[in-house]
A protein has these predicted regions:
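Solvent-exposed, well-ordered loop and adjacent helix/strand elements within mature globular domains
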Residues: 1-130
Length: 130
């Protein structure tokens, strides 16, 4: 069943001050890369029973692109999505915006989705430009 939610969207990087002690490893135990998205814990079933999304789900942010859910945000956030970027400059350029988050598409298969190119975004390297 497809879900559509209005969320705040921002960008994050693998800087230790923005993550935990393993800045290049996601909560789903994958490596950070373009196309990875972190959702607030209220949106991820592992942390909130009945939440709409699981790790590995492909989600769409209107006007931004498609992403694979592989990370979560700190517990203080709600109805929020955080897109992973390689650099702080890219994350700052993206800024903070509102978008409609839809999905899930292709639940449970983050690796295959990323290999199909579903989860590419940003700065002239394919996928949707933010």
């Amino acid at each position: 069943r497809e879900i559509a939610l209005s969320v705040t969207v921002s960008g994050y990087t693998s800087r230790p001050c923005e993550t935990d002690s393993t800045p290049f490893v996601t909560a789903a135990n994958t490596t950070t890369r373009r196309g990875v998205i972190a959702l607030s814990r209220d949106l991820v079933r592992r942390y909130t029973p009945g939440a709409p999304f699981n790790f590995g789900d492909v989600v769409h942010l209107n006007g931004i692109g498609d992403f694979v859910v592989e990370d979560v945000m700190a517990g203080r956030w709600e109805r929020h999505a955080d897109i992973w970027f390689e650099s702080l400059d890219e994350a700052r350029l993206f800024g903070r915006r509102r978008a409609v988050l839809t999905g899930p598409y292709g639940p449970g298969d983050a690796y295959q989705a990323s290999q199909r190119g579903v989860a590419q975004v940003a700065s002239g390297r394919g996928g949707a430009a933010p």
